[in-house]
Swiss-Prot record:
Main location, first listed in the record: nucleus
Complexes and interactors: Interacts with DREB1A and DREB1B in the nucleus. Interacts with CINV1.
Record protein name field: 14-3-3-like protein GF14 epsilon
Organism, as annotated: Arabidopsis thaliana
Keyword Lyase found: no
Cross-referenced InterPro entries: 14-3-3 (IPR000308), 14-3-3_CS (IPR023409), 14-3-3_dom_sf (IPR036815), 14-3-3_domain (IPR023410)
Subcellular locations according to the entry: Nucleus; Cytoplasm
Domain of life of the source: Eukaryota
Pfam families the record matches: 14-3-3
Family of this protein: Belongs to the 14-3-3 family.
Modified residues (Phosphoserine): S65, S188
GO annotation, cellular component aspect: cytosol; mitochondrion; nucleus; plasmodesma
Length: 254
């Protein structure tokens, strides 16, 4: 088992270096299927691989949606039809990636997690990928994805509050993404601000106890929390429609 694990982790690292992210996630899926608790490095390889696979498609979807709106405003019906078909292809790819990692999380990664940090990490990841599903879904499908995302984030919060310091980068990253979920998916800027402010204030109160190893990661996420708070507070005051900055952790945080 160890030889297989080492082999797949090595292949995943090679795939990352060569930016072959589809192969990276396949290698890490094989590690997950061994049903062992992943190391911090292995967790991050899973996260980075899927983040890149999904990230490119999320960017494509946003661009297509923007172009589609412009074509609709111009009354270019034929182009709108083409765009809808193209967007549907991207949405099918997005759904496939999300459902793939969500299955791995439910069947292997969460059941194999004994450490609090691992449990929080993978429930947060579950919340993230249901959130990505909710981004492009509508009607009952969107509600189902949003409900599943909310439950996963809540499970992550419950575990984090019992076992991780407020300054821990995994707990801070959870607060960042959960607050974005409230803002973008549930359209609740008040809840988003409340969650982000609480996480930021709790971390500030314990900043002196922050260890050197995670100082850079933690302060980076705290900065993103503060940036979002500034933007969202401005939106609340001015009833603006500006989009969220720093909606997720930077890639090197995953």
């Amino acid at each position: 088992m160890e030889n297989e694990r080492e082999k797949q982790v090595y292949l995943a690292k090679l795939s990352e270096q060569t930016e072959r992210y589809d192969e990276m996630v396949e290698a890490m899926k094989k590690v997950a299927q061994l049903d062992v608790e992943l190391t911090v490095e292995e967790r991050n390889l899973v996260s980075v691989g899927y983040k890149n696979v999904i990230g490119a498609r999320r960017a494509s979807w946003r661009i297509l949606s923007s172009i589609e709106q412009k074509e609709e405003s111009k009354g270019n019906d034929e182009n709108v039809k083409r765009l809808k078909n193209y967007r549907k292809r991207v949405e099918d790819e997005l759904a496939k990636v999300c459902n793939d990692i969500l299955s791995v999380i439910d069947k292997h990664l969460i059941p194999s997690s004994n450490a609090v940090e691992s449990t929080v990490f993978f429930y947060k990841m579950k919340g993230d990928y249901y959130r990505y599903l909710a981004e492009f879904s509508s009607g009952a499908e969107r509600k189902e994805a949003a409900d599943q995302s909310l439950e996963a984030y809540k499970a992550a919060v419950a575990a984090a509050e019992n076992g991780l310091a407020p300054t821990h980068p995994v707990r801070l990253g959870l607060a960042l993404n959960f607050s974005v979920f409230y803002y973008e998916i549930l359209n609740s800027p008040e809840s988003a601000c409340q969650l982000a402010k609480q996480a930021f204030d709790d971390a500030i109160a314990e900043l002196d106890s922050l260890n050197e190893e995670s100082y850079k990661d933690s302060t980076l996420i705290m900065q993103l929390l503060r940036d979002n708070l500034t933007l969202w507070t401005s939106d609340l005051n001015e009833e603006g429609d500006e989009r969220t900055k720093g909606a997720d952790e930077p890639q090197d945080e995953n």
